[in-house]
A protein has these predicted regions:
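Bacterial N-terminal signal peptides that target proteins for export
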Residues: 3-18, 27
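Exported/periplasmic ABC-transporter solute-binding proteins
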Residues: 13, 26-61, 65-70, 74-84, ...
Length: 265
């Protein structure tokens, strides 16, 4: 009998310990979600909307600090592939997200469609020599700014538009390629380019440019913003909570205020 009693004690102690550890793990997971730093790598075209959304999230979750790393989606994708410590990634096209997913770098089940955009042709405010895409071939138009198609989704969409309109080959010598869509906007604002191709939301935030034309929807791939948690996130619970907020009603309201078309899955 003493042996049996001893055996029962030996069995009970590990079970109790396991339960305690499980409770502690669950508690720590919730604590990390509520108190943490998160790194968000996102397409720079989202800057103004994300600034406001991050602020709103901080008000509701004062223990969380979201650090934004903004740039061209292709550049951010390569940073992640090279091991950059990122918790959440938002790209301006499916291509970059697909590449990361194919390499197993996304946390399974976290990928979300967030918003849509459109592609527009802009000129410096007050310019009258350009009234549409076809005017870009005029000799007076010397420089046309667009994103680098290999790394900037906005540049890839711009290339698709010009190709669809049978203008790309004629305009190659005039193209000024930028590192991201906000640099395109700056080139046009400062009149270092006669025209530029950006997202509608970029044009909306600047009083220094005018929208001359919107690219036909069938002239380019859909402009789709997607978000996902990275598999190597040090705090997946916190990252998931922020991504859920991005897909929620409050964030949708901000996206729509800045001209994005939101998606309700």
């Amino acid at each position: 009998m003493p042996k049996n009693k001893t055996l029962k004690r030996i069995v009970r102690i590990p079970l109790t310990t396991i339960v305690a550890f499980l409770a502690l793990a669950i508690g720590l997971d919730s604590l990390r979600a509520a108190n943490t730093d998160l790194t968000l790598s996102a397409a720079v075209s989202l800057k103004d909307a994300l600034d406001e959304i991050v602020h709103l999230y901080g008000v509701e979750h004062p223990g969380v600090t979201v650090h934004s790393n903004l740039g061209g989606s292709g550049t951010l994708q390569r940073q992640i592939e090279q091991g950059a410590p990122v918790d959440i990634f938002i790209s301006a096209s499916p291509k970059e997200m697909d590449l990361l997913e194919s390499q197993g770098l996304l946390l399974s089940g976290t990928r979300k469609n967030l918003a849509k955009n459109s592609v527009v042709l802009i000129v410096p405010a007050g310019t009258s020599q350009i009234s549409g895409f076809s005017d870009l071939v005029k000799p007076a138009v010397k420089f046309i700014a667009m994103g680098e198609p290999q790394t900037v989704p906005a540049g890839r969409y711009a290339q698709e538009v010009l190709t669809h309109l049978k203008l790309y080959d004629q305009l190659k010598s005039k193209l000024v390629l930028a590192k991201d869509v906000r640099q395109v906007l700056t080139y046009v604002e400062t009149e270092n380019a006669d025209a530029g191709i950006v997202y509608a939301t970029d044009a909306k935030i600047s009083a220094k440019v005018s929208v001359i034309a919107t690219a036909p929807q069938d002239s380019h791939s859909p402009v789709l913003y997607l978000g996902a948690v990275l598999k190597n996130s040090v705090n997946p619970a916190g990252a998931k909570a922020f991504l859920d907020f991005l897909a929620g009603d409050k964030a949708r309201g901000v996206f729509e205020k800045f001209g994005f078309v939101t998606i309700r899955d």
